[in-house]
């Protein structure tokens, strides 16, 4: 979850809003260098082992995509446009209010992913984490998930990783 690396640990108070702009800029610049270095290493490894059945792809994961759409400094709008990665992964909890939010997030990440790597599919945005706390959901989880999955399939999302088959949150 790249935004937590960029911002610091998650908690109820939004400390990111209090971080000075020059510090945010420096964090983004360093994050960009790190991700580009990782991709370069993966590219070199792929080049050195050409005849393997194993395919290795590098993804950058964003987890605060919806605020990135609104212009808040985030991985999606301040790092992703400046790196080359094979895939973009979205830990998509912030886009689960509706299939429309999921679509907005996927479109935003697709637009920001300008320097594509070696992933062979047209759609390079994957869902790296998705799920609900069933015990506290005040809606039909199965119905919501179906509408979101349908939207992801419609948009040719290559991978969707459901985080919790059994609810791992305390009651």
At which residue positions do the language-model features occur?
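Substrate-binding cleft of secreted/luminal carbohydrate-active enzymes
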Residues: 92-97, 121-171
């Amino acid at each position: 979850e790249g935004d937590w690396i960029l911002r610091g640990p998650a908690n109820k108070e939004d400390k990111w809003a209090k971080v000075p702009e020059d510090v945010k800029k420096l964090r983004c610049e360093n994050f960009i260098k790190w991700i580009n270095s990782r991709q370069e290493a993966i590219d070199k490894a792929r080049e050195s082992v050409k005849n393997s059945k194993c395919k290795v792809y590098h993804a950058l994961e964003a987890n605060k995509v919806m605020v990135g759409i609104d212009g808040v400094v985030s991985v999606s709008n301040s790092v992703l446009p400046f790196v080359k990665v094979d895939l973009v992964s979205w830990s998509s909890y912030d886009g689960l209010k509706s299939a429309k939010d999921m679509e907005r997030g996927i479109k935003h990440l697709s637009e920001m992913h300008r320097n594509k790597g070696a992933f062979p599919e047209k759609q390079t945005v994957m869902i790296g984490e998705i799920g609900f706390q069933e015990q506290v959901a005040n809606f039909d989880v199965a119905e919501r998930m179906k509408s979101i999955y349908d939207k992801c399939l419609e948009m040719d999302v290559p991978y969707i990783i459901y985080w919790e088959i059994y609810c791992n949150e305390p009651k």
